[in-house]
């Protein structure tokens, strides 16, 4: 069996991606436009079929008379996404941004415009030259008046796949050339875990390859999906998904492996496997794990050899577990009082985890909570007590639910992309810290409200910059950030807000300047297939010509860089196909070292895809080498071992993140002291969109209830409030109020309601503070505080609220129509 560690695999892929880019720059020189004459289309297809890809998979587009009429899944996709019709619809959706637009008051008064009127939809159409000149003037003004810390270019969001038209990298490239900017680090998905895990495991863990699915199928006796719904969430990928996880799950089901799903909602995954469903109160997972750990310890079921050889600090944690250090034993009975499960069920769960080979596959929602750092730290501690980390089919995994983690890695090369020109950072693009300074991404509102204020982050003290201008491309913060009404007040601190997108999201509607970008189906690009499998490299060929006056992200930023006097530095003399071919040729050079054959660029572009063989990747066992010899294969932690107790965190002295996994009361929870509202809001990932992407398409017809975002409510909670299926409901707390449509179902536990995150914010009266959101943006209700001083992640799952039948005047949802004048 291959002894390749997750760190080695991740580091090699990241290193190779960086080398791909640098080698391409050195080897190819200026490719210019010659490649366009060698098979690349400068224009969209008039009639016929063309292959391309998206966050939902590889597809073949059928074009008739210059219009895309169908997106059919690739015939080698084992589990095509049901969302492809919505992807097609996004090109022609009424939400398309057609022309460059400027908020009327900003056009007339500039930075003296009333900022509280943002979002009222009063825009004026301008020419591209007028829009780009205005953007360039604003960037220069802020740079000259405030320096690089006056411009925020963090621009977090899922954008679109493609190694050239990566709008966030391109934006950072332009802003770096313009003199610098304030960036953001981390992400909204895994902020707490990606800070705590390097202290515990020596790696981010959340974006690492998992033990391969074939190994899991062969060896795992019990699969536990803890706060994870991989049957739903693996439809999408950060790059182009291969959907390889579905083959693994199908094989696991066919084998009859026992599956447990721990979740307040009966998930699609639970239904698929016929799984046992365990539903603790939301936000009490750490208490449940502690009760299980106490059972293992008190019944002498823990693996003492693994703890002694592969971990450090268990004795200090055990003192807390038994109550020796604080007087409170974390027994199953203690846990039962907090999480609402019977004590005997907690004990039986613990015993079942050590009865055979067990894989703990955890999702990320349990760390998007107040004190979220504790959840995955405690999960690793529980897995360490079970003692199967590094064994085939055992241990834990934090990305089986994300981008098809566990899909076996191929022998192919890593594909590089365009650089932002700043500090070279290995790994995912959103983890970059290039720029004049950087803040944790979820603290953007704190930054705007507290310029010059100090904050703690991962052992360091930092100061919030005084930002005057924000530029957002490929993201929708008015969907993914918490506490919408607090955010709206903070946004008034900005003198200028620029948005570049292809659809009129709530974020675009609150902009001063709006630039229309193409969809990725109106330009050429190149991308990998399979975040973890690296199964293939795909030519993302242009399907149709750009609609209206939309321009590609590369062309927009190149034109902007030209106005800033940095055009040559931005383009380096390359056009679209020159860059794309350079990325491919760098991958070819890398493949030569691996004895992997690849066709010429011209043949590749003609064929549309090059696939790679899978050999050793099918046998990958995460942490096998570490388990075999921790001394010669140490982790990246200070001790080289799994740090159940972290001396580094101890030195930080944080009162909200102790040195070992600890149960800490969140700011609000069901059953918690002083809980003001009776229902927990489970803000789950949506089934038929990617966060907020595709909410403005025809896919909404699949799930909207009475024209609103659906709200799953238990029959008991519905009956107590006189609520019936299909009713329009008002969900409210002290932070805001939203309308949703009722779906009465026992799939959600009593005391909880489920509302998908990513619904587009649609204020009834944008000028009124705390106004009703007409459609159903769950982040109107969520709490905007950091998870702790350590990670400063978001707490998007820390929400208590109440619900009632809506008794107000009928409303019309307008967020899916274009603003007036647009």
UniProtKB/Swiss-Prot annotation:
PANTHER family: TRIMETHYLAMINE-N-OXIDE REDUCTASE, TRIMETHYLAMINE-N-OXIDE REDUCTASE 2. Its EC number is 1.7.2.3, 1.8.5.3. It comes from Cereibacter sphaeroides. This is Dimethyl sulfoxide/trimethylamine N-oxide reductase. Residues 1-42 form the signal peptide. Predicted to be exported by the Tat system. The position of the signal peptide cleavage has been experimentally proven. Pfam families: Molybdopterin, Molybdopterin_N, Molydop_binding. GO terms for biological process: anaerobic respiration. Binds 1 molybdenum-bis(molybdopterin guanine dinucleotide) (Mo-bis-MGD) cofactor per subunit. NCBIfam families: bisC_fam, PRK15102.1, TAT_signal_seq. The keyword Manganese does not apply. The keyword Signal applies. It comes from the Bacteria. It is found in: Periplasm. Catalyzes the reduction of dimethyl sulfoxide (DMSO) and trimethylamine N-oxide (TMAO) to dimethyl sulfide (DMS) and trimethylamine, respectively. The terminal DMSO reductase can also use various sulfoxides and N-oxide compounds as terminal electron acceptor in addition to DMSO and TMAO.
